[in-house]
Amino acid sequence: MKTNRVIKIFLASSEELEADRYRFGNLIRKLDNIYEKRGIRIELFEWEDYDAAYNGMRKQDEYNERVRASDMFLALFYKKAGKFTIEEFNIARKAFDEQASPKIYTYIKDLEAGESESRDLAEFKRLMLEELGHYWCRYSNFDTMQLHFVLQLQMVEATTPIKVEVKESQVKIGDSTIADLNNVPFTSENTTYRELQSRKEQLDREIGNAESGGRRGFFGQRSRTTDEELANLREERESVTKQIERQEKALVDTAMSIARMQGGECSPRMRTAAELFEKGEIGKAEAVLKEDDMEADATNAKLKFDTAAQPTAELTRNIERCAGEYMLKARIVVSGIADES
């Protein structure tokens, strides 16, 4: 098929995340095969790909040119923030300010027990929060990272996005599994979701026991009471399964909304709520987005916008952030409800 577009991705990270970079490369190759059928290619550039032959530029200058030409810039951090990765991040920021590209996404891997982050990384995170309002993705395993990226890719390639589906706790694009929701904290650590999964497992056991044995009549037939009980168990299992499916879809939809935040500015409330959601703490995430506070800020933002002699880009962004808070609140509320009613 004719190639209509090439999505260029620049992946920046230090050597400490070599294994994650390798697996990410495999993901890109898988996605490239899927998108190729729609005339779209996905091209990944990493520092390992660079031709070391001298071409009149130092290597980092070449990397920086690649950053400017990319559609997506991904920076991965773990325990430290390398100076070249920071330089590439700043180049990407400047390019985005000038040409609205590349979209910038930052991933920070969770520390293991006993590990600590460097001062450089702590300062970089402070800069992103306090000065840039930039929200990063936290990940503890590759399922989480893959899911984040695929949702972000949907934002970049919005013209012909490939539908993300959830089937039996597996997030899929076409026939390819992207993530197991049992390994993603916003589902695996979600109390309601765990309770539903636990109840379904219990029902499966009870139905299995009833089907293999159960109470029998004098001539070996299954008793009327047992047949009724088995029918009730099957009916409840079907209901619980539908509740799980609804909540999985709502949770992934909320994660998609959060993906829209990532790579851009967001309010401190949105960032805190998103972090709590990612941890599976739906109730706390909802509580952070207090309606009285949001209404007061929205009223103030609208007043400033309406009374400005010439509305600025910052005033417009304030309005957009307020609207984003309400949208995120609605998504989080829905994602905490498994019952259809």
Tell where the protein language model's regions lie, with residue ranges.
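Conserved N-terminal substructure of TIR/SEFIR domains
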Residues: 1-72, 76, 98-102
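Conserved TIR/SEFIR loop-to-helix hotspot centered on a Trp-containing motif
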Residues: 55, 79-97
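Hydrophobic, repeat-rich solenoid/adaptor surfaces of innate immune receptors and signaling proteins
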Residues: 10-11, 141, 273
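Amphipathic alpha-helical repeat scaffolds of TPR domains
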Residues: 231, 263-275, 303-336
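A short helix->loop->beta-strand "cap" motif at the edges of active sites that frequently abuts
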Residues: 95-112
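C-terminal interaction surface of TIR/SEFIR-family domains
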Residues: 110-249, 253
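Short, charge-rich amphipathic alpha-helical segments embedded
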Residues: 245-252, 261-262, 282-321
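Short coil/turn connectors between adjacent alpha-helices in alpha-solenoid helical repeat scaffolds
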Residues: 107, 221-244, 277-287, 318-319, ...
